[in-house]
A protein has these predicted regions:
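Glycine/small-residue-rich interface belts in oligomeric ring/scaffold proteins
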Residues: 53-74
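N-terminal, charge-rich interaction modules
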Residues: 1-52, 56
Length: 74
């Protein structure tokens, strides 16, 4: 199993880091992405084309999107 976590806010990035760490502790391959300003250590900056990352992994990778609820429901 492979998991990709994409976070969009500073708080979401911190949450994604904790979730990703748990996945990795359980032996699950997990990669976190965030805006460049929030990227550090194991958190990579968003790729130039995030849609391509999602397209390539669709059906084989589990994606977790962490963002503000106001953004998600609009």
């Amino acid at each position: 199993m492979k998991v990709v976590i994409l976070s969009f806010t500073q708080a979401g990035t911190r949450l994604g880091e904790r979730i990703g760490s748990q996945f990795r502790n359980e032996g699950i391959t997990c990669q976190n992405y965030a805006p460049a300003g929030y990227a550090f250590a194991d958190i990579l900056p968003f790729p130039d084309n995030p849609k391509e990352l999602i397209r390539e992994g669709w059906g084989e990778t589990s994606f977790l999107f962490i963002g503000a609820v106001g953004i998600a429901v609009r």
